[in-house]
Every structure is written in C-alpha cells, then in structure tokens.
C-alpha cells in the first residue's frame, strides 16, 4: 500500500521536463546507505556543515528523537533537485559567466551540473564540442572545498557538501554520463541522455528512456520510506558493492564507468536511436534493475569513502 501511495504521489507531484537522476527514492537510499558507513566523527562534521543549509530546519522537522542528523543527511541528497521547484531559484546557462562559480546558496539552479554529457555517435553523426562545465568539473571543485584546512568559508563548504551528496548519485546513473547522437537526433544535445527516446515499460507506461532509469527505485518518497525500502528483505542494503571499486573516489572515473554502462546496458536492444516508442523486453528491464541496484550501492560506498577522506 505504501508503494502504491508513493507511486500515486510521484505521478501527481513530479514536474514535467528534464528527469531528475534516481528521483527522491534513489538519492535518499544512496545517502542512507552512505550514512550508515560513516564514522561518528564524520557524521558530526557533515551535520555541522549541513546545518548552514537554509532548508535544514525542514529536514529535521518531525525526525524521530536521536535521528535528526540522519534525516538531515538523507534529505540533503535531494536538495539540488528540490531547488528546481523553488520560486526564488533561477535558471542560468552553461555558457553564462556564473556557470562554474560556487556561490553558497546563491539562488541559481545550475541544472547542467547534474550530468556529464560525454558525446557518442551511433552512426558517425558529427559531434559538437562538449560543454566545459558539467557534473565532473563541478564535483571536483566542490570536493576540493570540503576539507577544513582549505580557504573555503563554512557556507561554501556547506553548499559544496549539499551538492556533493547529490552529484555522487547522479554520476552513477548511466544516462547522466552520456549524450548519444544519430542521424535521427543530430542537433546540439543529441538524445540528452535518453530524454528523447520513448520506451514502453512492462506496466504499459510510455515515458522517455531517461525517466525510466531515474524511476527504477521509485519517485517521491519520505526519509522513512526510503529507509524502509532500503532495509526490507532484498532491498538495496543487501547489495554488496565491489570493495576495490568502492575505494575509487575520482568523479572522472565514475563518469567514464557510467558512460560505458550506458552504451552496453542502457542503450541495449530493443532501445532505438530515434523517437519511435519501443516496448522494453523482460530481459532489458531485468538487466536495468540489476545494474541500477549495483550502481546505487557502489555510489553509497564511494560517497562514504569520499567523505571519510575529505571531512576527517
């Protein structure tokens, strides 16, 4: 019943337009798993920074006693998506002078920070010059600001942490690391990471490929709901990431891995290179689900390892 209600709320409340990686449920589960791996000292340091986020009071409102830090950390994972719907936050463009600037809570949405569009041609369609500012370039800047011994102000460290928790999850969604070009989609942006291809899932819903992948874990959620789903039998808490891969904390490597997985799994048959809707096979959906779970678990482990290094 809870999953049905969440699905209904997601349908009613989620805005049309560009997909938001993993949606609330996926981002929250990743943050929850990462938080469980953090040392008490790192949890405290992260919470001290997150308290500077203007949304912190709403994050901890209603949290069970003693779980305020956990709830704040998990809520922070969706903050860069939440601001897209705030009336006092504004769009800017990747070509603007503001594109690369880290301005603490400066009321810009920076929607192009959510992905790294490595360009890929399916049929030798010419490729444009890639954007210089993306998820990888910005996450590297943010990571450099997180240690306490840098010249970054506390508000800047807080802003960087709020974004970093989210972007680690984004970069492990394969379609946030690629833009496929073809004769059917030759214009700037190509397929925009699967936003232009239409697929029909087993439930009969027609949606774009990117939204299908973003919604694998569900849509709208609460912190309680995400924790419940992660910890239930067969939930994300049971997926064990590769220990060696979990030690890799270079965003460029994560993006390259996701790019490769997009080509081999996300764009696998029966997905087309044009806008013609196609029915997904059971094999495709099973492979997508399995890969998404592995990527989310890996993202959680890497986020925890990253924060242990930069917040020690």
Question: Where do the PLM segments sit?
Answer:
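Positively charged n-region of N-terminal signal peptides that target proteins for export
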Residues: 1-4
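Hydrophobic helical h-region of N-terminal Sec-dependent signal peptides
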Residues: 6-14
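N-terminal signal peptide c-region/cleavage motif recognized by signal peptidases
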Residues: 16-18
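N-terminal, motif-rich segments that launch catalysis or mediate targeting to/interaction with membranes
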Residues: 20-167, 174-312
